[in-house]
Amino acid sequence: MAKKKFERTKPHLNIGTIGHVDHGKTTLTAAITKWLAKKGLAEFRAFDSIDNAPEEKERGVTINISHVEYQTDKRHYAHVDCPGHADYIKNMISGAAHMDGTILVVAASDGPMPQTREHILLARQVQVPSIVVFLNKVDLVDDPELLDLVELELRELLNEYEFPGDDIPIIRGSALKALESENPDDPDVKQIYALMDAVDAYIPEPERDLDKPFLMPVGDVFTISGRGTVVTGRIDRGIIKTGDEVEIVGVRPTQKTVCTGVEMFRKTLDEGRAGDDVGLLLRGIKREDVERGQVVAKPGSITPHTKFMAQVYVLTKEEGGRHTPFFTGYRPQFYFRTTDVTGVAKLAEGVEMVMPGDNVEMEVTLITPIAMEEQLRFAIREGGRTVGAGVVSKVIE
């Protein structure tokens, strides 16, 4: 059967939910799909279907990232539900990197919690351009003044991480009440629509990097029997058309191939564009030839490197970072795009050590090459915990 074509009639944005564990991110995602489905703009996704990876079921904690599709009257959204749990920051990093804007969910009954702060910090590091806040579980708070205080605290926290805290829309509601309701005139349901109006109005349509050379970080790789190998990911920049030559760059020697098909939401596209989540069919490539951490790119547009200068911010202990300084020879993981690579840090002449909270320049040598250019951002991690953030200031070799 021929696949249904994906129609591009509305602007497309990638958004998602972030926030502390159990503050209601997944419930809100389900409520959004329920009430947009009533307008024929989405398919309702129940809480369980969004929270669906088997190992998470027992604890009710979302570990993997769920992709949900819906529309408003103005836009088409691909929504990722990001895990809120500190153990799963890895997904948060690959997930938050996937957003043109985000909905920060905060339970009014708790106020901002450690992961709220951590996620705002990460949103800043991975450059999520804008945040809209959903103040959830307001039905559990009797005192309206308390809600005002939580809102004030949130605005201060956002300002602290260089988001425009005073301007950010904060919508109050109860995701659970909205999800359980069957009445479109219910005040809780109206708040879900109010939230989507705020997302439509406040999160700007991203400037797509359509004119830049094509590049897509590899998120996943699988085989479709009889058709070949498909790599999935979000197109970083440029346009890919069926028949285009591409290179697979990073981790191992660069390979040339041809893209023989582009798909999005299981529908065939003539082309994939910057910002789209797509699957690319690659000619003559085996599943074991490609891995997460590589990029698919226009030939000659990006090259693999192992050595670079970086500007790095080292998280404080309070931000969840290291408690102790590090020295030249420090060997953490450097998280580029979708994967961790071990590297060695060399501090500048005359710098003896780096303390948590410092902002420093350092030289980094990776053990495997990564497709790299100036301004590429990365996280520094130890045992799955983010301890720093950085940007490539100069490629050396």
Curated annotation (Swiss-Prot):
It catalyses: GTP + H2O = GDP + phosphate + H(+). Mg(2+) binds at T26. Residues 19-26 are annotated as: G1. Residues 136-139 are annotated as: G4. It is found in: Cytoplasm. SUPFAM superfamilies: EF-Tu/eEF-1alpha/eIF2-gamma C-terminal domain, P-loop containing nucleoside triphosphate hydrolases, Translation proteins. CDD domains: EF_Tu, EFTU_II, EFTU_III. GTP binds at residues 19-26, 81-85, 136-139. Residues 81-84 are annotated as: G3. Coiled coil: none annotated. Belongs to the TRAFAC class translation factor GTPase superfamily. Classic translation factor GTPase family. EF-Tu/EF-1A subfamily. PANTHER family: ELONGATION FACTOR TU, MITOCHONDRIAL, ELONGATION FACTOR TU-RELATED. GTP hydrolase that promotes the GTP-dependent binding of aminoacyl-tRNA to the A-site of ribosomes during protein biosynthesis. This is Elongation factor Tu. The lineage of its organism: Bacteria, Pseudomonadati, Thermodesulfobacteriota, Syntrophia, Syntrophales.
